[in-house]
Amino acid sequence: MVATNRCCVFALLFALLLVHSLTEAGKGKEVLGKIKDKLIEAKDKIKSGWERLTSQSEYACPAIEKFCEDHCAAKKAVGKCDDFKCNCIKL
């Protein structure tokens, strides 16, 4: 009789632990989902800020001028950045 009651108590505790674990796992997914959404939102803000910055030619050229210089140097020319277009001028 006592052994049966202990079994029931342990089974009840196990069931409560299982329910608690499943509940916490659901909350964990919810928290991870919120973190993922915030990271996506931050990425979109950074990307739109960069696009806005580079859409203005006076700011874009310094950002890509080094790429243009390197690209044209490989062709044995001088690179000149002009409104997002890399112009290679041969010497």
Curated annotation (Swiss-Prot):
Expressed by the venom gland. It is found in: Secreted. Residues 26-44 form a propeptide. Residues 58-91 form the BetaSPN-type CS-alpha/beta domain. GO terms for biological process: defense response to bacterium. The keyword Coiled coil does not apply. The full peptide presents antibacterial and cytotoxic activities. The synthetic C-terminus (AA 33-76) inhibits voltage-gated potassium channels Kv1.1/KCNA1, Kv1.2/KCNA2, and Kv1.3/KCNA3. This is Potassium channel toxin TtrKIK. The lineage of its organism: Eukaryota, Metazoa, Ecdysozoa, Arthropoda, Chelicerata.
